[in-house]
Regions:
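Extended hydrophobic leader/signal-anchor segments used for secretion and membrane insertion
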Residues: 1-138
Length: 138
């Protein structure tokens, strides 16, 4: 039994470090892909992005990765809870725990302006943008 542990001992540290790094990446970070030009010029189509899952309070202008109708999306927060927005020509107050989001390329973005329920709920936010990665690196 001792010889078995002597043989695997040199491999234990790299294996443990790799497992801890993978766990940390899964819990703290999120890797994403920008599929369209809806966030240009800020994020180019084809860019990879790194998001922070543990993001604290979200504010206007933050770029978030979230789920909407079963799809991951990347948009900028345009209004927070309590803010008044105009949706379909009517003033509305953003509900508690929700955000109103827009793409930076508003002429080519499917965002809160077009949804029946225009709000992103906090529980649907997966991450806050931490770092865009140059699309030429893909």
């Amino acid at each position: 039994m001792k010889s078995f542990f002597k043989r695997i001992k040199p491999f234990l540290a790299p294996i443990i470090i790799t497992l801890v790094a993978l766990l940390l990446f899964h819990v703290v970070f999120m890797l994403g892909y920008v599929p369209s030009d809806s966030m240009e010029p800020t994020l180019e189509a084809g860019s990879l992005i790194l998001g922070l899952r543990i993001h604290g309070e979200l504010e206007k202008e933050d770029i978030i990765i979230f789920r909407h109708d079963g799809t991951y999306m990347i948009k900028r927060i345009a209004a927070n809870e309590g803010d008044v927005i105009v949706h379909n020509g009517q003033p509305q107050t953003v509900p508690a725990g929700c955000f109103y989001v827009l793409g930076d390329n508003q002429s080519n973005s499917h965002d809160s302006r077009y949804w029946e329920d225009p709000y992103v709920k906090l529980e649907d936010v997966m991450a806050k943008l931490l770092l865009p990665i140059d699309p030429s690196l893909k």
